[in-house]
């Protein structure tokens, strides 16, 4: 009983609540009120009771140029509705039988226009359907009050940023006549849009109607064929004067039955118009508007307006007469660009240039050729950008001739900053390209060196080892090390030329890397003398193997010493090292030290002769080669790798190496010192002479001055002290003599 009472009370409260809700003006309307305009034709409005488009009741009203005028016209043709605002529709519509002024009934081919929706009562945002795999988004800007087309562009670009297509959208927060502060929209993937479009083609009855629902709609009803195509064709065939309308006499011969059937078909076409517009149809309308020629109109007003010029790909000012014309007519350049920038033909994405391909592809044996190609492409792209900026600069200066001097300076400063930004961007891209190239070259060199070293060690471990194979692999290994050294030195020379500060920073890493190369070669060569039979056979060919590639053309660079333990002597580039220079015993089977057979002549850097035979404290095996086992060799390689990782591998991915001056010239230093001493002596003598001359004064004797003399006599005495002689006195003295 209690549950029944509660249910009755709830039902009464619901009915009471529903009776308090005011009735909406649009209740009972078949479709939403809309108006459409086409310059040169009578305005059209849709009949909200039957969904058909009808001409202007007065037969005089044509296209309007202001939003206020459109709102007023909506209020005139729909006096029974409370029209409060207007907004452009999301989709174009096809309207038939559009009459010229002065003709109330006519039959002409179809015109496609974007109508204006007449909003009734308080603004209510459109409800949007969100299909599967689609996203609902919205944007609000409370400090902006923009048009419908502006927010359509915002929604389209937002979907494009997500690699999706705009499916549907609606305005938010009205702030004026056809002005809003936001937009809500639905973005769908491209494949979803294609499925939606295909389903629309298969059956138009599945679309959403304008405003209310069709009372005769059912899922089993056959699709209503569109009359637009063949009506347009028939009308065009009957158009003899080519003005787009049928001739006058055709209106008089129209059969009432045919006219009634035509009205029914027209109603069906209007009823099948949907709100789920595709982006392509909107783009077609925007393109038709923005690519039209600018028209001043018949009136003689002088209004400054903007129209879009597709050839120049920008908006251009023109003078509008105040009436007529077309829709390629905008109040500001910003509004013009916001609407028409999307109508430009989208350029197909160009294939990736050589720079992008270089960064995407891994390094291979064609590294140098790929790098050269990428560098040329980068320079060509930079020149093209600079040429474009220079052309824009010339155009801006030509347009700024009549501007004030401050504006001219602002234009010049703007383009100077633009050029500087392009230069900085190009420099950064070059630096990135060079660093990538150097890292890849270093990786290739490391790979080749590691491979040749493994092959060389494998040949030494062979049983029995073959001398010719060992020599060949030794040459390849030494060549790989020399390429690494040359690469390091050349790169350092480049860095020192371009950026001396960076060269000073990476100098310690350069020295460490060069030292590691020498230590690696020393240890690898020391292993050769653990195989006396091979060493004795190829000792005369060791020098060509190690020294043939040691003719480094890099200026101021000294070829590496491949003796047992390299000493850099008095080289100013190298830090002080405590290298052992004590002579050691002769090697196995009377072999001399490696510096006698390997060393290259070096007159500037003294190298003490040392024996390359490994000693026990170096951690190398000293047993005969017959007892040298395969599992003992990695110990040497491990030590080498440790030295390498400690001295070089830490930096090779980020640092680039090039050599500084390796040799020192004592004669030049002594000459500079002597010259400096001579110059200093000359300067000191000159200063002493000048100072002595400064204190020299003229004295012609001592004149005793009485303290009681007058000021005139005292002044005369001072003058005489400085060499003054009274000519009168001198004359009388000469007369007396």
Swiss-Prot record:
GO terms for molecular function: heparin binding; serine-type endopeptidase inhibitor activity; signaling receptor activator activity; signaling receptor binding; transition metal ion binding. Cu cation binds at residues 148, 152, 169. Residues 286-344 form the BPTI/Kunitz inhibitor domain. Keywords: Amyloid, Copper, Disulfide bond, Glycoprotein, Membrane, Metal-binding, Protease inhibitor, Serine protease inhibitor, Signal, Transmembrane, Transmembrane helix. A motif (YENPXY motif) lies at residues 724-729. Residues 193-280 are annotated as: Disordered. The record marks 300-301 as: Reactive bond. Residues 690-737 are cytoplasmic. Residues 1-18 form the signal peptide. It is found in: Membrane. Glycans are attached at residue 522. Residues 29-124 are annotated as: GFLD subdomain. Residues 193-207, 242-262 have a biased composition (Acidic residues). The keyword Ion transport does not apply. Disulfide bonds join 39-63, 74-118, 99-106, 134-188, 145-175, 159-187, 290-340, 299-323, 315-336. It comes from the Eukaryota. Residues 29-190 form the E1 domain. Gene3D superfamilies: 6.10.250.1670, Amyloid precursor protein, E2 domain, Amyloidogenic glycoprotein, copper-binding domain, Amyloidogenic glycoprotein, heparin-binding domain, Pancreatic trypsin inhibitor Kunitz domain, Pleckstrin-homology domain (PH domain)/Phosphotyrosine-binding domain (PTB). GO terms for cellular component: cell surface; early endosome; Golgi apparatus; Golgi-associated vesicle; membrane raft; plasma membrane; recycling endosome. Residues 354-545 form the E2 domain. The record marks 171 as: Required for Cu(2+) reduction. This is Amyloid-beta A4 protein. It comes from Takifugu rubripes (Japanese pufferfish). The gene is app.
